[in-house]
A protein has these predicted regions:
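Short, glycine-/Ser/Thr-/acidic-enriched flexible segments
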Residues: 53-54, 67-68, 162-166, 188-190, ...
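Residue-level signature of catalytic and energy-coupling elements of molecular machines
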Residues: 15, 66, 179, 249, ...
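N-terminal amphipathic/basic leader segments beginning at the initiator methionine
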Residues: 2-37
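Buried hydrophobic packing segments
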Residues: 22, 26, 48, 92-93, ...
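Glycine-rich phosphate/pyrophosphate-binding loop regions near the starts of catalytic domains
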Residues: 28-188
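Glycine-/charge-enriched secondary-structure boundary and capping motifs
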Residues: 2-12, 119-137, 150-157, 208-209, ...
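Short, acidic (Asp/Glu-rich) active-site segment that either coordinates a divalent metal cofactor
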Residues: 156, 169-216, 220
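Hydrophobic face of alpha-helices
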Residues: 23, 121-124, 195
Length: 345
């Protein structure tokens, strides 16, 4: 008897029916991200979006793509997959907001060893939540089953976003000047960077991730899996309220690699390390791993997920705008003359 295509494919390790079930399970989560501009429904060959460009004189599209990295291993060890998608969205939208762009839509890509519909739907529920927090629509995605290439439980997650900003309103660091103020927007922890080192130091494969830690005030697993903060709405509100001259998403490479990306030649962001409010999880990692201070600031966000540089006259307005969106930002430095672009002292 001739084997049907789907049966033959299933025998090779790819379960098409699991894919169909996954789409059905995630449909409600996807639809709750839909905002004005969404034209297509889930399941089409392409995601359609008609942006409202009213009031823009020269709209510019801004794209960003990223993944979650080895933080995914924590999700697997804890068997908790419904928040990791927030990280995926955050890593993309927090990048495009650095030039002042509002994210419009998002697409995700999941590569997985074995397609378990409930697991995939949980991952996508996190992606949807991230999109809701960012105010963008989830208009498409792909789940690819990779038998023979990935272990059954393994998966990778990546995403792609497109935003828009009116060209005259693109954040221009060329206007930055001595005396401008550096604001720190608190992070929720490691966010989605440095997890290869984190996993090694904490020996997560053998650690009791569910044990309550008095120093942390929570379990180690909770501290390590906490989702990345999405700064889109707070930063957009800050841009409306203040004279924003630079925004830096503090990701891999920490302060030393990310702050200079928004600092023009001849100027330097002088950061007061004593002002930085660093969560206990960072100090615990530093102590346990014997990591020196410079390496910590050159690898992790150290409690600052985003740095926003504003004119001194509008610093209070910026802080108030961020506070109104639930972000307790604070001053952590100033712009001075210099060639190093960032100095921590």
């Amino acid at each position: 008897m001739e084997i049907s295509h789907s049966a033959a494919y299933a025998a090779a390790g790819v379960d098409i029916t699991a894919g169909y079930k996954g789409v059905k399970l995630m449909s409600a989560d996807v639809k709750r991200t839909h905002i004005p501009g969404v034209v297509s429904d889930i399941g089409g060959f392409g995601g359609l979006f008609a942006p409202d460009l009213t009031g823009m004189t020269e709209p510019v599209l801004v794209s960003g793509t990223d993944g979650v990295g080895t933080k995914l291993r924590l999700a697997e060890l804890l068997n908790k997959h419904d928040t990791i998608g927030i990280d995926c969205v955050a890593m993309c939208v927090n990048d495009v907001i650095c030039c002042g762009a509002k994210p419009l839509f998002f697409l995700d890509y999941i590569a997985i060893g074995k397609n378990v519909p409930e697991k995939v739907a949980a991952i996508v529920s996190g992606v949807a939540e991230g999109c809701v927090q960012a105010g963008c629509a989830l208009i498409g995605g792909e789940t690819a089953e990779h038998p023979g290439m990935m272990a059954a439980d393994d998966y990778d997650l990546a995403g792609f976003t497109v935003g828009v900003v009116d060209k005259p309103k693109v954040i221009d660091s060329g206007r930055m000047a001595e005396g401008d103020v550096v604001l720190a927007l608190p992070s929720s922890g490691f966010h989605s960077n440095g997890y290869s080192l984190v996993r090694k130091v904490f020996d997560v494969e053998n650690a009791d991730l569910g044990r309550y830690d008095d120093e942390l005030g929570e379990t180690l697993g909770e501290a390590l899996l906490r989702p990345t903060v999405i700064y889109v709405k707070p930063v957009l509100r800050c841009i409306e309220a203040a004279d924003v001259k630079g925004v830096s998403h503090i990701t891999g490479g920490g302060f030393y690699e990310n702050v200079p990306r928004c600092i023009p030649d001849g100027l330097c962001a002088k950061i007061d390390k004593a002002a930085i409010k660093t969560p206990a999880i960072f100090r615990l990692l530093q102590k346990k791993g014997g990591i020196d201070e410079h390496d910590m600031f050159n690898t992790f966000n150290m409690g600052v997920g985003m740095a926003v540089i504003v004119s001194p006259e509008t610093a209070d307005a910026a802080l108030s705008a961020l506070k109104a969106e639930g972000i307790d930002a604070y001053v952590c430095g100033e712009i001075v003359a210099g060639e190093e672009k960032v100095v921590l002292c």
